[in-house]
Amino acid sequence: MAADGRGGARLSESPAVVNVDPGWLAARAAADTSARASTVETLLPDLINYLIEIRAVDGILEIIDLGAGTGANQKWLAPRLPFQQRWIHLDHDPVISRSLPQPSDTMIIDSSVESLGRLLAEGSVDQRLVTCSALLDVLTTAQLDAVCEAVIDNQVPALFSLSVTGAQSVSPVDPHDQPLLDAFNDHQRRAGRAGPEAITLAGAALRAGGFTVRSAETPWQLSAPGDSAFVAQLLQERLDAAVVQDPGLSVIAKAWFELRRAQLELGVLQIEVGHRDILALPGGTSAFAERAEVEHRADVTTQAEPLYGAGQRIREQIGASEP
């Protein structure tokens, strides 16, 4: 598993390559499903309505899944879309995908996210959807820019899921929570990655490209004893990344983990890890646009943290899209 504990991504070149542990992907599956309940309630109805009313999908919907990993995103999304589907897993190193049985309607393409534009230029965009899960925050800003540009240029709807936001709350509270989290988030930004700002950057870029964008908060909400094994693994991975980023935190991290492990054993530890999904549509119903505008203005009003590590093109798009 990658030191940042963020399985699911396959990137195109060093130093941004992420190694994925299938065990980690399996461990997080239950947390992902629970977290996406808000997407089921808010974003999926809008997506389905758009595909039926605006795109008039009546044949096969082709779904391109970026960084597909084990195919968990397809397993989750496919039964929730009332269309005949053909899936394309676009993965630079699809070792995991090829090692697992796949539905007959699934194609695996060994290529990087930068090839999305070329892939979308082929065939009918009216019958396509781009999606990914747990990917955007481990892309470099250049790769994120390429994904958004491909979606905009080809006017394809997109559903991007489970991107980390950098937020985390742990109960009981400890004074070392924040410095350890700050170091972890800085580690997420290493080597030019978009990190915790990825989902905000993507939303801004897509709005600047004329898309209507809605979001749903999809945090992991974990507690002992039911999630103890996963929480212990998650915290250890995050601490490892924090110490790599700031070796001076080594002693603090070790003591902090021992404290949290004891609280897990006592059944008193709770943790929430921020994630967000976005649905981006090239046009849409007026009701969807109104909801999206209300959400966007609320996000702009409450956003207090600066954006880090953005590519110049995306920075310009953000400036152009703000009211």
Say what each PLM segment does:
Residues G71-L116:
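Class I SAM-dependent methyltransferase SAM/SAH-binding core
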Residues V156-T218:
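Conserved catalytic/acceptor-binding region of the Class I
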Residues E290-P323:
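Early extracytoplasmic/lumenal segment of secretory-pathway proteins
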Residues A2-R55:
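Class I SAM-dependent methyltransferase Rossmann-like catalytic core
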Residues R214-E265:
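C-terminal helical/coil "lid" or tail adjacent to the Rossmann-like core of SAM-dependent
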Residues T131:
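A conserved beta-strand element that flanks and buttresses the S-adenosyl-L-methionine
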Residues V138-V151:
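A short, conserved alpha-helix within the catalytic core of class I
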Residues D58-G69:
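Conserved class I S-adenosyl-L-methionine
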